[in-house]
Each structure stands twice: as C-alpha cells, then as structure tokens.
Amino acid sequence: MNIKTVTIIGANGTMGCNISGIFASFGNAKVYMVCRNMESAEKAQIKATMSVKAEAIGKNLIPKTYDDLEECIGASDLVFESVREDIDIKKSVYEKIAKYIQPHTVIGTGTSGLSINDLSEYFDENIRQHFMGIHMFNPPYNMTLCEVTPSDYTNTDYLNEVKMYLKSVLHRNVVEVKDEPAFMGNRIGFQFINEALQYAELYKDNGGIDYIDSIIGPFTGRSMAPLVTSDFVGLDVHKAIVDNIYKNTNDYAHETFVMPEFAIELIAANKLGRKTGAGLYQTILNTDGSKSINVYDIVTKTYRAKEKYVFPFVKQMIKELKVGNYASAFNKLNNNHSTEATICIQFLIKYVIYGIVTTKSIGENIHSADDVMATGFNWVPPLAVIDAFGGLEAFRQIAIEKSSKEFLSFIDMNEILKDLPKSKYDYRSFFKAK
C-alpha cells in the first residue's frame, strides 16, 4: 500500500496532532491537518513537529480547516478521524466527508472504544469496506502499539494492506483485535486502574490514593503507579472508558469497572487530573520555582501532602531489583504476609488472569495481551509476570494460595492457566527499582 497523502480530521487534539507527526515522519506523507480554524491548525502543526523531534517534517504538515475538506480528502490515500469520543460528533464528521471519499481511500478512526461496526454504518456500503479502527496509544512516538479493528464489512485485502503499512512503514506493533468495548489494551489496563481506584476508597482510612499507589508502583512492572496513570490520562477519559465497558460487557470482572463516587465528584468539580492541575493528585508550584505533589484525601475531601509510605516488602523488593536479583525480589513479596503485600500480589495475579481471559476472547493469539500491555502501556505483560514468578507451575500454586476465595469462585484457575507459553518479552526490563 502506497500512502502518499493523509488527511487527519481533529488534528488539534492530542492524538490527532501526534499521529500527524507519525504519518509525516515515519511515513514521509503529505499530511493535511484539518481543524475548525486556521489558528488551531497552525498551532497543531508546530506541536506535531515537536512531538517527533524532527523539524524537517514541517514541510509535510499542512494546516487546513473544514472548509478545505473537498481538496484534502479528494487527494488523500488515507483519511484518519480523530475527533472527540462522542458518537454524534463522529457521525456529523462522517456526513461531511463521505461525499469526498475516493474509491481507493482508506478511512480510519482513532476511537479508543466505540463500536467499529456502529461507526461504519454511518457510511454507504461501498465506503464501509475501507473503514476500520486504527487505535494508537499516546504518545505514539514512544508507544508503538496500534490496535487495528475491522468491522463486519471491512475488506480483508484492504485490512491486511493497512496492517502491513502500519508495521513496515510507520513501525507500529500491530495487534488485530475484535470489535469489543475498549478493545484490548484499555480493557485490561483500566480494569487494573479502576480496581486500584476502588481499593483507594476501600482503604481510605489507611491513606487511600497514595497508599494504594505505593503498594503497586513501578517496582511491580509499570512505568508509573496506576492512579498516577489515571491522573495523566484524565479522570473524565477514565470514566468514559470504564462506563463503556461496564455498560457493554458482563464478564467476571464486571463490577471492577464501576468508578467510585469520590472520583465522580472530582470530575463534577472539573478536577480531572494533570490537564486541569488537580485530580487524584495536585501539582503545587512553590515560591522558589520548585514543584510539590499533593494528593486528594478521600476522607477529608481536601488535598494534603503526599505521604512517603515505608512498607518492608517494598524496601526488600527494590533492594533486590537494584542488583538484579529478580527471583529473590519475588520471593520477598510471596513470603510477606502483610496487608500491603497481600494487596500487591493479588493485584498482580488478577492482572495476569484478566489479561489471559481477554486475549483468548478478543485477541489474535495468546500473545496479544502481552503485545498490547508492553507496547501500549509500558507495563510488564501478563505472561511475563508468570515468568517472573518462576514459571507456570510456580505461578499457578501462588495464584491459588494467595487469591481470595471470592475471586477463585469466579474463575477456573487451572483451565485459564492451561498450556500457556512463555512470554516473548523479558520481564526484567519492566520491573523498576523504585
């Protein structure tokens, strides 16, 4: 597939802007950056150039407005829609662009969870066969995952050509997933994040948000703690993802997608996270120019200084991780019977199980969950967690011994863990000594 010209609709948004940079740099494509007004488009052009750290691509990025749709789409090999996650807004955009789409043009949507089948039905049948989900992760320059989702109408040849282009030209780690709510990466990732948020409420008298983040932080195989991640993404986006999953699925983890009331109250107060300056955490600029971090106290409903919790198992794990004694680090966790260590190991077990269940349900193969979590979230992949605990049999024994009776009643542990391969990923690169 030879894609020389691309139109990005909604190019002023974070993802639309960053993806413009990917097409212009890796793809060396002419990219029409369509925004509602020229001022927004010109600002987006500058940001896109900065996002890939390559000023030379500026010549490939062309600011445009909706008044230029006929010119842009008529000349494009691929049209990428990246407007807000609102089905009515997307429908309105599709109505505007449909009349200009050429017979050869690929149409992609960057939706992070809306149904590809539902969206495709806003187009005529001859256009639907070229329509698919192309979901990249932010920032795409660093996170190479691209979830590709066909609809029931997508032409297989077009699908395969687009996947090859994404792999070979844009250097994406492409995972084809079924048209299920939140697809795969966000389904697995936000199950973990939202349950961590529920645990923050459950353990609010112990400290709540920063207490839980201290228990399942970077030393457990993720680039940042889960509730820091929620703040980074935005509580409003977090809520949209989990609400969609809760409404449209009914697996054993269904109730873990209910957002706690305190977080809904923060959203109502426009305390959405990093983008508004306060959410679960709050950044304070001190008079000397330095920054300090406060955290939302669920009990008092005010912000307080972030605590520096000292849990023996965490200190021991980090000490072992620093010198590369991974087996010893996980033995320290497994042999510690404190409340905090139990929470930590149970979260890791549940993450593995949900990842495997999800990849069997909606992935291409058993390694799909590993691919999406490693390259979309920079989290240790589920199968790699099993390797870190000493292999399948060792993990099975630990999982049965450490899981709650309630959790074990929901699942068939032995069946889920049956005949699993080793991960393609080296777990050692994900566990941070901090």
Identify what each model region corresponds to.
Residues 1-434:
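N-terminal glycine-rich phosphate-binding loop for ADP-containing cofactors
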